[in-house]
Amino acid sequence: MEIGQYQPNLDGDGLRIGIVQARFNEPVCNGLADSCIEELERLGVTGEDVLLVTVPGALEIPLALQKLAESAQFDALIALGAVIRGETYHFELVSNESGAGITRIGLDFGIPVANAVLTTENDEQAVARMTEKGRDAARVAVEMANLAVALEQLGGDDDEEEDEEEEA
């Protein structure tokens, strides 16, 4: 049996990408942002189509993502941050709450959100992962933005027909 299959599309030409970067653990977050932006450019996203905003920490990322999503100006969003375990329960709280908030934005607004908020045991693990995870976030955002467009087109002209029926 033959089945239809969508091939991943990493062409970023014409896509608008919003990035929210936490400033807490700034060297790691800057490394994530640098590699992410470099990869977006490699994928064809132009600098004028990228908006980078910074927030104090990982818990503030979801609100900034929400505001970007509400603007309807972006094809995909990217969350960048680093939560590094300390000696208290705060690590679990920040990791869980920021992750849940980031996921909720994508689902509530129907916009792809690439989550590259690192959660590591120590600084060394964060530094070791920042370049690769920044690149991964760029690829995820571009691929999912293109997939979202392709899947929206599956509905065809149903929306127009519904609008015409409502007007009649």
Swiss-Prot record:
InterPro entries noted in UniProt: LS (IPR034964), LS/RS (IPR002180), LS/RS_sf (IPR036467)
GO cellular component, one term: riboflavin synthase complex
Entry keyword annotation includes Lipid biosynthesis: no
Record key words, sorted: Riboflavin biosynthesis, Transferase
Active site location: H90
Gene3D superfamilies: Lumazine/riboflavin synthase (3.40.50.960)
EC annotation from Swiss-Prot or TrEMBL: 2.5.1.78
A GO BP annotation: riboflavin biosynthetic process
Any one GO molecular function term: 6,7-dimethyl-8-ribityllumazine synthase activity
Catalyzed reaction equations: (2S)-2-hydroxy-3-oxobutyl phosphate + 5-amino-6-(D-ribitylamino)uracil = 6,7-dimethyl-8-(1-D-ribityl)lumazine + phosphate + 2 H2O + H(+)
Pfam families: DMRL_synthase
Enzyme class: transferase
Pathway: Cofactor biosynthesis; riboflavin biosynthesis; riboflavin from 2-hydroxy-3-oxobutyl phosphate and 5-amino-6-(D-ribitylamino)uracil: step 1/2
Residues that bind 5-amino-6-(D-ribitylamino)uracil: F24, A58, L59, E60, A82, V83, I84, N115
Residues holding (2S)-2-hydroxy-3-oxobutyl phosphate: E87, T88, R129
Role: Catalyzes the formation of 6,7-dimethyl-8-ribityllumazine by condensation of 5-amino-6-(D-ribitylamino)uracil with 3,4-dihydroxy-2-butanone 4-phosphate. This is the penultimate step in the biosynthesis of riboflavin.
Stated family: Belongs to the DMRL synthase family.
Name used for this protein in its record: 6,7-dimethyl-8-ribityllumazine synthase
Species whose genome carries this gene: Paraburkholderia xenovorans (strain LB400)
Gene that this polypeptide is encoded by: ribH
